[in-house]
C-alpha cells in the first residue's frame, strides 16, 4: 500500500509540474497596462438607491440602445429577507452611467403561477466586446431575458426553490413595459 501511495503522489506531482511548466507568465508591464485600462478612478457610490429601508437593489445589468445607456436591476421589497414578497425587475436610463432615471418595471409580481413572487431578470444577448456596441441583440424578432422565478415569498429561495424562466418582448427596450414571461419554467429543480 505504501508503495502504491508513493507512486500515486509522484505521478500527481509530475503531472502538476508538467502542466505548470507550460503556463505562461504575464509580465508586470502587461498587468499594469490591463489595470490602467480597467481601473475605476472614482468611486461614486450607489447610482440607483432604494426608496427606503424596506427595499433592496441588486444585480444591475447595463446595455446600450442608440446613444443612451439602460440598466435593468432587481428590487426586493423587504428589509431582512423574510418579510418581503420577492423580486421584481426594473429599468433605468442614463446618458453618463452616473445619473440614472428609473423608468419602471419590466417583470412585475403576478397574481398566480410558478413565478408569481420572484421575477429577477437578466437581459440576454448583450454585446460585451471590449469597446463594443453593448447593444442587446434580437433573436427571432424579440429581445430576451432569462429570469429566476418562484412562488415562494421572501429573499430568493428562502421558502421554496427558484426555477429559471425566459421572458421576451417585441416592444421598445428603452421603455418600461411588461415583458411576456414563461408559462412554465425552462429549468427547474
PLM feature spans:
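A residue-level detector for conformationally permissive "hinge/kink" positions
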Residues: 9-10, 96
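Beta-rich carbohydrate-recognition and catalytic domains
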Residues: 24-121, 126-189
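Hydrophobic h-region of N-terminal signal peptides that target proteins for export
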Residues: 13-22
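Coiled-coil-like amphipathic alpha-helices with heptad-repeat character
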Residues: 1-2, 20
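Bacterial N-terminal signal peptides that target proteins for export
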Residues: 2-9
Amino acid at each position: 500500500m505504501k508503495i502504491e501511495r508513493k507512486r500515486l503522489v509522484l505521478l500527481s506531482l509530475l503531472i502538476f509540474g508538467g502542466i505548470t511548466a507550460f503556463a505562461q507568465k504575464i509580465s508586470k508591464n502587461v498587468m499594469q497596462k490591463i489595470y490602467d485600462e480597467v481601473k475605476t478612478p472614482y468611486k461614486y457610490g450607489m447610482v440607483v438607491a432604494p426608496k427606503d429601508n424596506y427595499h433592496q437593489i441588486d444585480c444591475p445589468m447595463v446595455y446600450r440602445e442608440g446613444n443612451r445607456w439602460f440598466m435593468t436591476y432587481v428590487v426586493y421589497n423587504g428589509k431582512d429577507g423574510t418579510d418581503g414578497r420577492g423580486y421584481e425587475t426594473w429599468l433605468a436610463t442614463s446618458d453618463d452611467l452616473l445619473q440614472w432615471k428609473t423608468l419602471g418595471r419590466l417583470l412585475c409580481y403576478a397574481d398566480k403561477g410558478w413565478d408569481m413572487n420572484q421575477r429577477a431578470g437578466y437581459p440576454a444577448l448583450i454585446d460585451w466586446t471590449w469597446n463594443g456596441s453593448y447593444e442587446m441583440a434580437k433573436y427571432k424578432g424579440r429581445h430576451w431575458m432569462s429570469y429566476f422565478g418562484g412562488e415562494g415569498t421572501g429573499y430568493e429561495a428562502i421558502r421554496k426553490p427558484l426555477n429559471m424562466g425566459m421572458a421576451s418582448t417585441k416592444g421598445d427596450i428603452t421603455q418600461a413595459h411588461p415583458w411576456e414571461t414563461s408559462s412554465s419554467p425552462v429549468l427547474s429543480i
